[in-house]
């Protein structure tokens, strides 16, 4: 596949809107408002997509400018902090490869059974031979990413997250929550944070902005091993891998799902973040959060959005 080159286009993303403000807050509010320009076609696609998932938070942002084009449940999207699950894997893999801390061809065996601390994190992918980086991202192999994360220090993990803007305000809303990140102290805690199940909670705007940042980084360095590996893994994931439901909308997409529950346990919530059309100069970043469900459910919402979007050819 072709690496991501010169991506522009759209991104799905959440935003909360403030009430009366003054001074610096007024300036920030004006800046935020300038980033909101509703595109009727994308708004219609969002509304069609959530008919069967009325609690979904779905946001569409232009990737090049960051302009918000369409959304649903903006305020909740900006205020809801949740464990991100496997959606962190692309950013962490890219950082590890780009910084020379990991070899893309290193293979890790997976028995599909994994326990880290008190968490049982068994893989749901098919039985497979030891995987390299591209394959592990395609199938979201927890054993592989636990092994990778185990080589990172707490400081390096924080650096990987900060490079994508995951631990800071996005500036997309005046009343947004900021990621809750608990500094890991042990190897297990680093692994759990990297797998998105403990020690970190983020919002949909933060996650969408992180993928927008990652897309821009890969577009700026299209020939690197890091870009070729991560872009291929994301495309494979949304084509035939764990995020395959996203491709049902008839638009080529590269993306990642995440399924997680609160640190205390309980019902799962689902995420999907995708870039569409995959491998094209005109790109949409699709971010969906379901407060109840799985990543595959969120990917299905994204596929319905893309099926009704301006990207779908008649």
Regions flagged by a language model, labelled:
Residues 1-11:
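Bacterial N-terminal signal peptides that target proteins for export
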Residues 51-55, 61-71, 97-102, 113, ...:
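Glycine-rich, acidic and aromatic/proline-enriched surface loops and short helix-turn segments
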């Amino acid at each position: 596949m072709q690496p991501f080159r010169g991506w522009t286009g759209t991104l799905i993303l959440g935003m909360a809107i403030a009430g009366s403000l003054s001074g610096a807050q007024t300036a920030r509010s004006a800046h935020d408002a300038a980033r909101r320009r509703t595109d009727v076609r994308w708004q219609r696609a969002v509304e069609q997509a959530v008919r069967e998932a009325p609690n979904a938070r779905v946001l569409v942002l232009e990737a090049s400018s960051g302009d918000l084009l369409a959304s649903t449940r903006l305020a909740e999207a900006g205020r809801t902090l949740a464990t991100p699950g496997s959606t962190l894997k692309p950013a962490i893999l890219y950082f590890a490869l780009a910084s020379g801390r990991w070899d893309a061809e290193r293979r890790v065996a997976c028995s599909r059974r994994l326990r880290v601390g008190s968490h049982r994190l068994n893989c749901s992918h098919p039985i497979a031979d030891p995987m390299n980086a591209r394959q592990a991202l395609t199938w979201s192999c927890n054993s592989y990413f636990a092994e990778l994360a185990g080589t990172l220090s707490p400081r390096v993990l924080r650096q990987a997250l900060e490079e994508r803007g995951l631990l800071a305000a996005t500036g997309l809303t005046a009343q947004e929550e900021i990621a809750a990140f608990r500094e890991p102290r042990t190897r297990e805690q680093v692994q759990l944070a990297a797998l998105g199940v403990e020690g970190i909670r983020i919002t949909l705007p933060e996650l969408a902005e992180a993928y927008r940042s990652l897309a821009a980084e890969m577009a700026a360095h299209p020939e690197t091993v890091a870009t070729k590996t991560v872009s291929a893994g994301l495309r494979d994931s949304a084509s035939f891998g764990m995020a395959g439901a996203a491709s049902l909308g008839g638009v080529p997409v590269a993306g990642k799902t995440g399924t997680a529950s609160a640190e205390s346990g309980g019902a799962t919530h689902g995420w999907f973040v995708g870039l569409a059309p995959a491998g094209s100069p005109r790109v949409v970043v699709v971010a969906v959060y379901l407060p109840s469900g799985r990543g595959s459910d969120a990917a299905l919402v994204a596929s319905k959005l893309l099926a009704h979007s301006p990207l779908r050819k008649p």
